[in-house]
């Protein structure tokens, strides 16, 4: 199973992809989406959305977990 984890934030959104096979889990990719405070809100949200969509398209997770 492939899981995309997201730690949401407007200035910095962290993400990571793990893959599990049986009892073995490994990190496949991770990163941080940084947006600038002086950019309009809609542009910042658009950047976050676009990069999360890229991760979903590339890694095709079966589940997504979002930190509360």
Enumerate the predicted regions with their spans.
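Phosphate- and other anionic-substrate recognition elements at nucleic-acid/protein interfaces
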Residues: 1-68
């Amino acid at each position: 199973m492939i899981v995309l984890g997201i730690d949401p934030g407007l200035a910095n959104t962290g993400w990571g992809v793990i893959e599990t096979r049986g009892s073995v889990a490994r990190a496949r990719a991770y990163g941080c989406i940084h947006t600038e405070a002086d950019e309009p809100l809609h542009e910042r949200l658009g950047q976050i959305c676009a990069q999360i969509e890229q991760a979903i398209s590339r890694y095709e997770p079966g589940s997504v977990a979002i930190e509360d």
